[in-house]
Amino acid sequence: MSATMRETGWAKINLALHVRARRADGYHDIETLFAFVDGGDTIEAALAATDTLVIDGEFAEGLSSGADNLVLRVLALLRARYGADRVPPLAVRLTKRLPLAAGIGGGSADAAAMARLVRTHFLPELGDATLARIVGPLGADIAACVASTTCMGSGTGEDLHAVAGLRIAGVPVLLVNPRQPVATGPVFAAWDGIDRGPLYIGTDYRAQLIGARNDLQRPALAACPAISDILLELGALRPWLARMSGSGATCFALFDAAADRDAAKAVLAARHPGWWLMAGALR
């Protein structure tokens, strides 16, 4: 495919995730601080006679390239809303670099990347908030992934707002996954129902993040004990924060310096060649 358009599905992490209540509709009220890493899946697209999707990359196996894929659903939704004259058919290639069912956005990041690609090239009048409102209902975290910038999420995670004075762009981060998928639904279902209090993040974000938590970590450990091993190993490599993201199994560590992050990655790569590792910085 001769690609003329390109976007990145930035990896999402939950720097903290407080579960506050189980709702009558089966969903949960949460408070979370979303952040994004400067790496992820890539989407390339070119004008075509009809929509097509090809998926390649390390984590392509088992993914559907049919109309049920979120990438094509976003394309179809925007075309239905704005017309085929404004949103033409595209041949799309999705390169999967992020593990699946891993707590770092994955399909939501890809859907948001497709939405941004269409916006950039065909619907430039759409702002992030409008785009998120349109495509957000297609899946959890898509609304946050549209802008892919640090923000607080509440409700089911789709009520988004900025945190005044929070400047964490450029913080070195290391992502680690044991290559074991963890389904989100069962982890939320196994939450113990105890509200352990709200999430507050202000300008003293380091101390506040250290004092925060991921309430899904305990139920995720039951599904994937390797999470405990990862957190123990990360903690020994002296980050200022190590925590599980989302419903797992990916864990992250934040460091003071890129050299410390890179040294930690080298240690883990040597000790655990089967683990997936990605070094980057927060956007």
From Swiss-Prot:
Q: What class of enzyme is it?
A: transferase
Enzyme Commission number(s) of this protein = 2.7.1.148
Pfam families the record matches? GHMP_kinases_C (PF08544), GHMP_kinases_N (PF00288)
Task: Specify the pathway.
Answer: Isoprenoid biosynthesis; isopentenyl diphosphate biosynthesis via DXP pathway; isopentenyl diphosphate from 1-deoxy-D-xylulose 5-phosphate: step 3/6
Work out whether the entry's keyword set contains ATP-binding.
yes
Binding-site list for ATP: P99, L100, A101, A102, G103, I104, G105, G106, G107, S108, A109
Active-site residues (renumbered): K12, D141
What processes in GO biological process is this protein linked to?
isopentenyl diphosphate biosynthetic process, methylerythritol 4-phosphate pathway; terpenoid biosynthetic process
Q: Which UniProt keywords apply?
A: ATP-binding, Isoprene biosynthesis, Kinase, Nucleotide-binding, Transferase
Reaction(s) this enzyme catalyzes, per UniProt? 4-CDP-2-C-methyl-D-erythritol + ATP = 4-CDP-2-C-methyl-D-erythritol 2-phosphate + ADP + H(+)
Q: Which Gene Ontology MF annotations are present?
A: 4-(cytidine 5'-diphospho)-2-C-methyl-D-erythritol kinase activity; ATP binding
- Coiled coil, from the record: none
Record's HAMAP family?
IspE
Q: What's this protein's family per the entry?
A: Belongs to the GHMP kinase family. IspE subfamily.
What role is this protein assigned? Catalyzes the phosphorylation of the position 2 hydroxy group of 4-diphosphocytidyl-2C-methyl-D-erythritol.
Q: What PANTHER family does the record point to?
A: 4-DIPHOSPHOCYTIDYL-2-C-METHYL-D-ERYTHRITOL KINASE, CHLOROPLASTIC
Q: What is this protein called?
A: 4-diphosphocytidyl-2-C-methyl-D-erythritol kinase
Origin organism is Sphingopyxis alaskensis (strain DSM 13593 / LMG 18877 / RB2256)
Q: Source taxonomy lineage?
A: Bacteria, Pseudomonadati, Pseudomonadota, Alphaproteobacteria, Sphingomonadales
